[in-house]
Amino acid sequence: MRSDMIKKGDHQAPARSLLHATGALKSPTDMNKPFVAICNSYIDIVPGHVHLRELADIAKEAIREAGAIPFEFNTIGVDDGIAMGHIGMRYSLPSREIIADAAETVINAHWFDGVFYIPNCDKITPGMILAAMRTNVPAIFCSGGPMKAGLSAHGKALTLSSMFEAVGAFKEGSISKEEFLDMEQNACPTCGSCAGMFTANSMNCLMEVLGLALPYNGTALAVSDQRREMIRQAAFKLVENIKNDLKPRDIVTREAIDDAFALDMAMGGSTNTVLHTLAIANEAGIDYDLERINAIAKRTPYLSKIAPSSSYSMHDVHEAGGVPAIINELMKKDGTLHPDRITVTGKTLRENNEGKEIKNFDVIHPLDAPYDAQGGLSILFGNIAPKGAVIKVGGVDPSIKTFTRKAICFNSHDEAVEAIDNRTVRAGHVVVIRYEGPKGGPGMPEMLAPTSSIVGRGLGKDVALITDGRFSGATRGIAVGHISPEAASGGPIALIEDGDEITIDLTNRTLNVNQPEDVLARRRESLTPFKAKVKTGYLARYTALVTSANTGGVMQVPENLI
């Protein structure tokens, strides 16, 4: 066993003394059992994580029952909704790297035989997956689950995205103060990740198709008995996988990454999943070309439109058959998935999901009646984004295939929000927000406030927004993010000027500023070099080491320093 490194031999008597002091070893034979880490992310200020202490206790009991010894440790967590719109958002994406580093540190320092990961919200899930790829110790994931959708006094279904858009609607005067406060009180009624197909739930669904979690991980409610039983079953399966030495890198292959993007296309997931899945591929040693994502989009139908793109919540998806029903439907179209891959269940993706039929065709459409013949995400290329950009086409009004309007440029999120709120931004604009990428932000903050204000003011079909920053999973509208290279790295988005004509072509997947190359070249000659905004602390180190969005925004030490 891997843990023999810390518990076998006379020279490890001091380590054994410390292990006895933890109280985790209940009998003399316990030292001969596998040691299992429970990597938890319980935190009081994140509603998606307030219940995870209880879930960890269930996991501990089941791990003991299965014949192993559990040891729990905790990671940090950032609630993107609470951190939104201020300096706190600069820490959100960088927290992913801290989580990965922290988990790697504890797992490798103590030579655990296996790891039971309990994530839930936006950066915690991918951070833990990065750690699993890095350490490559037998592992299983069981998330905390989504919250119930809210309900307004008028019977309208609510999610957190409803609340963000309500801010713009209230400023516009289209809803009353009473309605506004009612929504605030009822948008998030229980613990769990936010109820729509936002980043947290997107990643928790993708873990099912990646093969790292049990079926229904992405949709079973946080408050359900099914969630608690899933924790128990996952614990039993992990101990079995430790004995069989089934490791994360055996499961997460290039084909698994393909299938993760295919499910994302079918469910119209968050654009952040592109960033995180590319980072996972990078950590797994898989060279993954962005063009591959568009090829997947072309062959994958869009089957389930979930909030913020509709009024359906994750619970509605669960009742309609969950991710297994979507996977089963996709498997009926040859070449869409790679169903004979091994998963954490010890069975193939096909064996896990075959025969799981759709129970509600309004929530999950069948292959012969998709929302769209192609997937809900697209990678755009062009002279603004030579290394790619991402748009959630599933969140764009279906009537819009191309959009050509005049640029109005801002060098920060805050400048753009002020201009939208004071009506400087009008119908016919393409809002350009730059110097908000991984280096520029720093931390690639989410642009939910400006996109929500645009939609809330009724301009969702008349104003586009492009940025080297990123979006919340709650974003909808004509919103292009992750533009690479970013402005801080000298990317062409830095060369756009007010009044330039910009074309977003969703059919041909292009993003261009309609200026001759010689004009752009002259502008580049006068471009002021970027200077880091933060000089001290973690964000300064992050700025120095982070890469562009097209590689997942991972931190890499320059080769000349290794």
UniProtKB/Swiss-Prot annotation:
InterPro entries: Dihydro-acid_dehy_C (IPR042096), DihydroxyA_deHydtase (IPR004404), DiOHA_6PGluconate_deHydtase_CS (IPR020558), ILV_EDD_C (IPR056740), ILV_EDD_N (IPR000581), IlvD/EDD_N (IPR037237)
A GO cellular component entry from the record: cytosol
Molecular function per GO: 2 iron, 2 sulfur cluster binding; dihydroxy-acid dehydratase activity; magnesium ion binding
List of residues binding Mg(2+): 80, 122-123, 446
Residues recorded with modification N6-carboxylysine: 123
Binding site for [2Fe-2S] cluster: 121, 194
Reactions accelerated catalytically: (2R)-2,3-dihydroxy-3-methylbutanoate = 3-methyl-2-oxobutanoate + H2O; (2R,3R)-2,3-dihydroxy-3-methylpentanoate = (S)-3-methyl-2-oxopentanoate + H2O
Cofactor note: Binds 1 [2Fe-2S] cluster per subunit. This cluster acts as a Lewis acid cofactor.
Pfam assignment, any one: ILV_EDD_C
Cofactor(s) this protein requires: [2Fe-2S] cluster; Mg(2+)
Disulfide topology: none
Active site: 472 (proton acceptor)
GO biological process: isoleucine biosynthetic process; L-valine biosynthetic process
EC number: 4.2.1.9
Pathway involvement of the protein, from the record: Amino-acid biosynthesis; L-isoleucine biosynthesis; L-isoleucine from 2-oxobutanoate: step 3/4; Amino-acid biosynthesis; L-valine biosynthesis; L-valine from pyruvate: step 3/4
Keyword Protein biosynthesis: no
Gene3D superfamilies (UniProt xref): IlvD/EDD C-terminal domain-like
Entry keyword Transferase: no
Keywords from the UniProt entry: 2Fe-2S, Amino-acid biosynthesis, Branched-chain amino acid biosynthesis, Iron, Iron-sulfur, Lyase, Magnesium, Metal-binding
Quaternary context: Homodimer.
Recorded family membership: Belongs to the IlvD/Edd family.
Functional summary from the UniProt entry: Functions in the biosynthesis of branched-chain amino acids. Catalyzes the dehydration of (2R,3R)-2,3-dihydroxy-3-methylpentanoate (2,3-dihydroxy-3-methylvalerate) into 2-oxo-3-methylpentanoate (2-oxo-3-methylvalerate) and of (2R)-2,3-dihydroxy-3-methylbutanoate (2,3-dihydroxyisovalerate) into 2-oxo-3-methylbutanoate (2-oxoisovalerate), the penultimate precursor to L-isoleucine and L-valine, respectively.
HAMAP family, per database record: IlvD
Name the UniProt record assigns to this protein: Dihydroxy-acid dehydratase
